[in-house]
């Protein structure tokens, strides 16, 4: 009668677990669908942002020439892009043509006249310049033009990148007054000048330099401007990129201090391009730059080598060379093997038809009985199979309880011992295992020498349970 009562209670528990399992499956499906929806929304939003940004840059950079030496966007494009002039994408006539050519087309004159009052102060007096415009650096220019007089530039910007103005004719005028370049834009962007010829200025930069470093987008005084060569801004131009020399002016001692470059600069291009200015590549950096760069690379290589050296060292510590330590390690794994073999023996007696018991533990036997009893085609419970498995479970648990095994305490302790001590990595020799090498007395001595006193009593109980099960089925205690 007590067996029927326990069977009914177990059956109700199994049905309850089935319902909980179905609810958990539904919850997991909802969570997965929610995560997939979030991922799809993020991917779609990111794609829209990137495509819109690159499309806007492509439209701003595209401007067909309408007059010789003057590049003006179409009226429709100007209407759609009202900020193109602010971005410096509207290019005006070359600097020399503005000053020397008395006649311009009506379209060009309308744009040049408002700048006439600005061009003369540019060459004779102080001019305010901003360096917030990034498009001026995209204009290819010759690196040989330098100033003869004191200038005030922002960090990371040289005169070549500030002017950035290859012109259709030679520019021989020299700047005879100091220039003030506040942070915000470059000279090319403030003038809006683009050219199709070469810029030839033979003067050299010999005056004092004052640096303004209040621009939020520029690097500090001791650093340089980091330029990404894979940026869509660079890909929008059809001409090679001229990277300025990596020299930061020093306002104290008037000496250009080279800094370690942060980007790989473009190789110098041989020859001239038709319709564009001649590109004379960046000046070679000093030996200090090479030394610092090589020092950083060498330090990185040392870190990688050190990491590779430490990794096998940690792995080798798991297998000590000392024979005494090796014996201790084997004894610890024998403790875990005893607990593992007891779990495996219990599961094999309940599920003898299963070869692999991955995911099966004594703690989840009721749940595994339900899973094994469900028909995979119609998901109906096979009551006969469920009853058979339940009887096996009740029989072996009653046998172990007579030895002192507690179904609420010892399954968790078994898992703890396996996780703490591990199991044997390799199968012992077949003759040794069958010849009685792992006897009860030997394994008891191992437990006494290895297990902590707080767990020793339970560990000895697990060993006695394993010995009883092996005696009942006539097999060795360690089944491989």
Curated annotation (Swiss-Prot):
The keyword Coiled coil applies. Expressed in testis. Expressed in pachyten spermatocytes, spermatids and epididymal sperm (at protein level). GO terms for molecular function: gamma-tubulin binding. Disulfide bonds: none annotated. It holds the Pfam family Speriolin_C. Residues 2-45 form a coiled coil. Residues 252-297, 305-324 are annotated as: Disordered. PANTHER family: SPERIOLIN (PTHR22192:SF16). Found in a complex with CDC20, CDC27 and TUBG1. Interacts with CDC20. Belongs to the speriolin family. This is Speriolin. It comes from Mus musculus. The lineage of its organism: Eukaryota, Metazoa, Chordata, Craniata, Vertebrata.
